[in-house]
Amino acid sequence: METQPASVPCVLPQDVYEFSEDRESLGRLRVSEMPSELNGGGDGSKGDGAAVVATEVSQQSNKKRKRCGVCVPCLRKEPCGTCYNCVNRSTSHQICKMRKCEQLKKKRVVPMKGVEAVDKDDAKNQAKEQVPSVKNCSESILVDGPKTDQMEAGPVNHVQEGRLKQECDSTLPSKGSEDLANQLLMEANSWLSNTAAPQDPCNKLNWDKPIIPNHIAANNNSNLEDAKNLVAFSAVAEAMSNYGMPASGTPSSISMQLYEKFNYETNQDNSGHSEGNAPSCPEDLNTLKEALALAKHGVKPPNCNCDGPECPDYLEWLENKIKSTGKGSQESPFPSLGQVSKKLVQKSYHKEQVLNLENTNVTCPSGNLPFSQNALSLAKEKNISLQTAIAIEALTQLSSALPQTNNEYPNAPSQPLINHNDQLTHFPTAKGNQLPMLPLSCNELFQNQQAQLYTGKNALPVPQSPRQASWEQNKKPGYQESEYIPENLSQSSSVLPSDASTPQKKEFLQQWVQNADLLKSPSDPMTGLKQLLGNTDEYIKSAFKGPEGLSKKIKNVKSKHTIKSIKKESADFTKMSPDQQLSQLLQGNDFHRNTQAALQQHLHHKRNLFVDSNTMEACTQEQQNWWVPNSQQAPVSKTTEKPVKERKKRRQSPSQKQVEPKPKPPRKQVQIKKPRVKEGNAVFMPVSQISLDSFRRVEKEENQVKELDLENSLPINVQPDLLGSQSIQLTGSQANLENQKTVNTQETCNENQTSIGKANNFALCVNKTNSLVAKGRCPTPSTGDSSSGQGDSANQHTNLTDVPGQNDLSCIDDKFEDLIKQFAAEFGEDFSLPGSEVPSQNGERPPKQQTSGVPQFKMPFPSQLPSENATHSNPALSNNLLTHNASHKFDSLFSSKSPKQIKIESSGAITVVSTTCSYSEENQHLDGTPTKSELPFNPTLSGFLESPLKYLTSPTKSLIDTPAKMAQAEFPTCDCVEQINEKDEGPYYTHLGSGPTVASIRELMEERFGEKGEAIRIEKVIYTGKEGKSSRGCPIAKWVIRRQSEDEKLMCLVRQRAGHHCENAVIIILIMAWEGIPRALGDSLYDDISGTITKYGNPTSRRCGLNDDRTCACQGKDPNTCGASFSFGCSWSMYFNGCKYARSKTPRKFRLIGDNPKEEEFLKDSFQDLATKVAPVYKMLAPQAYQNQANNEDVAIDCRLGLEEGRPFSGVTACMDFCAHAHKDQHNLYNGCTVVCTLTKEDNRMIGKIAEDEQLHVLPLYKVSTTDEFGSEERQLEKIRKGGIQVLSSFPREVRKLSEPAKSCRQRQLDAKKATAEKKKLQKEKLVSPDKTKQEPSDTKTCQQNPGVPQQQTKPCVKVEPSNHYNTFKYNGNGVVESYSVLGSCRPSDPYSMNSVYSYHSFYAQPNLPSVNGFHSKFALPPFGFYSFPNNPVVPNQFMNYGTGDARNSGWMNNSFEKKPELQSLADGMNQSYGSELPEQNYRRSSEVPHHYSLQNSNSQKSVGVPHRTTPAPMETTPYSNVPCYNKVIKKEPVCDPLVDPFQRSNSVHSQSPGVNHSLQTNDLSYKANGALPSSGRTNKEGPCSMFLPSDKNGLEKRDYFGVHSNVPGLKEKQWTPYGIDVPVGQRDSLDSQCSGKVWSSCKLSDSPAVMPSTVQDKNWTGRQASLNQGVKEPMPFQEKLWNSVAASGRCSTTPNDRSSVTPCAELQDKNWMSFPNPAVNSLKTDSSQNHWDPYSLDDNMDDGQSKSVKEEEDEEEIWSDSEHNFLDGNIGGVAVAPGHGSILIECARRELHATTPLKKPNRCHPTRISLVFYQHKNLNQPNHGLALWEAKMKQLAERARVKEEEAAKLGIKQEVKSLGKKRKWGGAATTETPPVEKKDFIPTRQAATSLTDSTTTAFSYAYTKVTGPYSRFI
């Protein structure tokens, strides 16, 4: 490794300067460093050296050194982007290491040299430097403000200044020195390890600074002090940044020293070190080993130019040193008093006190210092003085503990640590002066703090995470040994210190949470690392874990070594021996350091993140603290003495807030309250249900326990002191600051120790604080008791606060109860816990403890864990705490369960505590009280990461683990391409198989399949991304891959990923097992499935069944035979948001239409057996995909198919001649596949024989490779010649087209709903209309019946049974087919009703589809339009019950004509009905115009303009009998009226109907608006138009909507034969009589004409018209005009059908109508007598007519599609596979676009291909079909409803308002509709008048108004 010419020391100043954030801070840093160095060099002449250095530094800082501009780094223009500075550019203001001028680096050597000399001469200078560095570190740790500002703001500056002055460094501003030291340390860290550099909280590479070497070299006090400061700072910094590096500063400094020595030895020229540097370098084995470990983990000297994370030369040198070195000097300068004082000052200790402490420490010889093993080992390993090591360890421990105390995250943690360190440091420095402080080493202090933190009683509530445990264990050796227990505490009980430590641990945890870096600072690198790495997002959790582990380990160690030493050492101040702690730290740190070394870089990176996280954590803690009433906040206020630090401390330490509980906590509570309210709207428990009593009880119990613990743990005298001292501490500013800090730490500890630790620690702190305050010192006792002392003081304060708080718990409870009540509804869980916890903790403390015990948040039972910790720490206290806390834990969890108990949510590997549950009832205890630091309450990223579900507001989310979704496979890391672009190379997935080459794929498949050679065929396909499809957007194939021979068993399609040569360069996209199932099984399945499903199956409408325009009829048009898909097994329900059987007690996975249990069982057996047999094949061929799908089998076995273990499928879809357009199965399981079992027709089961009609499976985005798997083009051509690959050419093909776009399921559903609503309204109106009908003229008796459908029903003239129609159509069982509009309806029960989702019978099957579409459309076409549309015999109007399902008549055919309508009325009805049919047909044409409204009277047109098929379509699937027109009794108004006005009205009303439109316009005069039958045409509410309209009212409404047409055909005022023939009245009568003789349905009439070919129509029309006329008894004289007009109107009305079958319509209109007039009537008479056809009886000529009309319509619909463009572009894909009978195809349908080609003649009754698609839905992974989810959802909905109700009640809003609103809507709609009706009535104006005059009419208009209400838009 090439070292930079400048030795690290030299580089350091420069680096610091270069990297310093600003000159000022740099100057300060330099001043502090240099003075310390100079001081060190000055051999104790601190002042002189300091002055000189200060001068130099100030000069340097004042005059920024300029780059030489000639060295390589200067010439380098671009930053490397990889070094720490570059990576952390935003935070590190230093230049890229690669661009750092060599001269600047060298330049720094001068100060270093001086410093080194000084170091050798005077260690105090280093100590001083260390102090500033420590301050800097803390400052860097501090989140509140700039390090400089913080340092300046901190009283430590004064102390430092005083100390510096004492050290003769008066010229240096303490802050500047601190900054300098910090920067130096930072640089040293970075220097020692580039990664370590980040360790420096300041984010500056201070390791480069020679100060560290100075520490090493210097043994004098100044050097020791500087070293201590630097080490402490580095330790804190590294602890903060790398946590894993306990004394990262120390190791860094050691490393720097070592590296300097290394440079000195290897590159003396380049090393700027003085000769003393090398000798000064500590070379003890521990130090060397530690440096080696660091170096191995990427901690390189700053000058190292080696590439990579390690410096081989340096490593080798270290190894050699280790070999040659026996033991390094254990002496290491203790952290300088300056450091300690700085820290103390930073902690807000009085300057005088700090100085006193320093003096005392100075007086204390290092020998007197109780050194922890960690400190000793640290000193040895790092080659630093024992004092330095102690300082480092103390700082490390303190830093870990300090985070709790930090008001400013960095400062508070570091300050408490520093305080301990200061104490310790001073102790060592004093070496004899401060025995009390000395008893605990820094490590001990740190450990004690942490131990207390972790092991204190408060720790009990805080569960220890394994990480924490391990961390604590690692740290414990030192901590336990060094655990300091103030004399009071030790006297009271060893447990108390443990408690204190535990609370501190808790605090530490809090601080950890708040300050990940600080938390990491504890000596245990593992814990820090774990916390940093593992708990970045889970500071609380990590805190819990770390503290727990620590508390346990610390408890053990402390109980052994620490407690003893602590008791001995804790006499006065902290009595923690830094050496002991250091030794412990070193012992545990060897391991930790290794870990740290490994994680150091990562931690450093994390540190930057964590700094923010710490800030967030602090905020979180504050938020947590909100739980604590003002008492906690009051301490915060005290902390506020030091605005920034204290504030941070406040944030950090809930206990501190508790200690200073006055106003802020409530504020925070409010804030938190608000956020929580925001976070959780629906809490598990309503406020009313929240029981605070349990919490209070728990709190009381906890308080009692705490009090008992305090009493037990604390000496009796101490307890009073606790209370008194608490106030004292609060009183003393230093005490306050320290207490605040302590409190912060304490809070952390307290959270752990909450019950006991708080009181104990608090008492200790109070006593010590009191003594300290009295002494004028910062309450070092608590601080000195790093873990116990400081934590104790904090805990004491907390405990005191808690004790009062406990006493105040009732008050707090009241407050919290209020809060809880306020938040309970939304956060009830959290609030419940807070309430209980707060009471137990003092109310304030508990929340904070929870805050500090953030671990509680993570730990299900933080209280329990903390109890354990406390127990470990203090056997007595721990026992008490454990017992009490455990009881509380359990009580909290069980007895004091908050209404919202903690819910442990787990999703995959993530387990989250319930969001608003305040974590757990145990948390309700001290620790249980959620604190802000518990993130769940804070909307922070870390909080979210901590508990994602907590941010879910719904109880369902918190209660339930949402279905685990397997993440999409990540792209493999390969260097083949810069970026994987699936658009270019195709979708990436490997679960079917992958390999580097095609040959590897063959090997793979041969291994899987077990055969080789020809048995396996591999075809290469190329992804083009261009979809091959016909001009109409339907699937096409360009290449067909076929099975070549029987020898071929397996075929795989593989794709070469463009540009890839990696292990996944070739992936399998499709596997075809030609013989997937036995032939016999396939044959039987084909027969069984085709027979059963065809008869009883319920087709499923699929979007992929249509092209983009939704106009293709690829499935076929015949609803009985069109291709369709049928779903079985479990499938996803949008309603349940889970399996559709979520609420099914007895799921019918293989449900068929109707009640066919035998068939269902048979089908079930077939599919289950098949699934059982297919699964092994799937497993064999695609094991990974199979496994992915079978993973959750045991969990969701209810949603799986198969009879044996290994069920990869949740559902199966049977596609029968179903053409699936290109699509992806987006909802399939991630990394799963669809397995398609193909069954083909008998003529397509031979290999090598291409059937006349076949269906192919297409991959539209792929093209076939020009070479075979071996790269041979010849072989590929040979395959083509042999038929293995069929190359298709462009050719035009006849395709089916829908006249109108098919409606989507959503549209159909909406229409159905609207129709239903209208039907209901119509039914209501019908009830009223009969009376009105009665009111109508007697001559219109029969017609009058129209208005009164009930009358009609009661007096049926003609009864029609729609059921027959259905039966005729064979829709009884297969209503599905009809309903299967464009692939079937979802509701086979009523496939024919508008209500049915698929009320529109398969458009493919509907010859008159256009009409159907039109009718289906929202247009208010007359029902006839819809159902006359069924003119196609295939789909009678009844099936199209758009209007037929008229609720009013509920099947006029059944009852509508119960009262025989006059023949005229019937004729009118008939005319309208069939007229409408004809018109429907015409309507197709006219509809093309205005939707079958076009030609009618202008008014009628206007009215027609409103396509009102709403009613008709919406009508139930009611048979035609139910069709309004059918159901309706054709009602007539008085003949005179009907002839004219009524006709006009009807005409106007019906004018909308297309058929009528034309006729009306042309023949308007003849029958005016509607074919003016007095009542039947116009008046019948249920008249012919009503046929079209569900009810007469609807008819009117719809007539209005439909226009004349609906009513006109049969409703002309004049009685006209339904035939529209001018038949004399007598004839009409005869016709009527004839018609009446036979039950007939106008629908049928309409059906037949529309459906039948012209000839058929002619025939039917004549016969039927006659029959109609016959049926129509009152033959009002039919005007030929009317008839003609009717014919015309028929045309018009037919127009709608005309769209679908224009020709038939035209013929009917022309021929039929022409022929119909009189001859038709005659023929009608004859035919009617013979062929009185029932529109429902599909038999009468209907079949013929249907077939003919269907054929004609199909012919008309068929168009030619050309795919030539696909073949012109060779890159357009279209690779198809011709699946054979019994073959199994496996593909990733989720990722690959796939399709199936349409069949020429689809016939699902005898399907060409049955595709059984087995799949697994991605989310069907819940047991019992996801019933729990559903129930949770229902609960959630109920809760929401409850909340809404409560809100409504609060607002005084009545829930009825909504219904009123709806009514208003309806009313408004009705009102709106009414005007539209009037508009429709433009021609219907008369109708409107009639409405006014005629009750019937009025009813209609009203009904119209109501019905149209929301549907006014249809008008």
Swiss-Prot record:
Annotated positions binding Zn(2+) 2: 80, 83, 86, 96, 1221
**Which terms are listed as keywords in the entry?**
Chromatin regulator, Chromosome, Coiled coil, Developmental protein, Dioxygenase, DNA-binding, Iron, Metal-binding, Nucleus, Oxidoreductase, Zinc, Zinc-finger
Q: What's this protein's name?
A: Methylcytosine dioxygenase tet3-B
Keyword DNA-binding part of the UniProt annotation? yes
Q: What happens when the gene is disrupted?
A: Morpholino knockdown of both tet3-a and tet3-b causes defects in embryonic development, including malformations of the eye (eyeless), small head, and missing pigmentation along the lateral body, leading to embryonic death between stages 35 and 40.
Top EC class, one word: oxidoreductase
User: Which PANTHER family does the record cross-reference, listed alphabetically?
Assistant: METHYLCYTOSINE DIOXYGENASE TET
Give the UniProt tissue specificity note. Answer: Detected in embryo (at protein level). Detected in embryonic head, in developing brain and eye.
Tell me which residues bind Zn(2+) 1: 68, 71, 74, 101, 1060
**Compositional bias segments (type: Polar residues):** 629-638, 838-854, 864-880, 1340-1355, 1494-1503, 1720-1732
- PROSITE patterns the UniProt entry points to: ZF_CXXC
Query: Which organism does this sequence originate in?
Result: Xenopus laevis (African clawed frog)
Q: What does the record give as cofactor?
A: Fe(2+); Zn(2+)
Subcellular location(s): the record lists: Nucleus; Chromosome
In which residue ranges is the amino acid composition biased (Basic and acidic residues)? 1308-1339, 1482-1491
Q: Can you state which reaction this protein catalyses? A: a 5-methyl-2'-deoxycytidine in DNA + 2-oxoglutarate + O2 = a 5-hydroxymethyl-2'-deoxycytidine in DNA + succinate + CO2; a 5-hydroxymethyl-2'-deoxycytidine in DNA + 2-oxoglutarate + O2 = a 5-formyl-2'-deoxycytidine in DNA + succinate + CO2 + H2O; a 5-formyl-2'-deoxycytidine in DNA + 2-oxoglutarate + O2 = a 5-carboxyl-2'-deoxycytidine in DNA + succinate + CO2 + H(+)
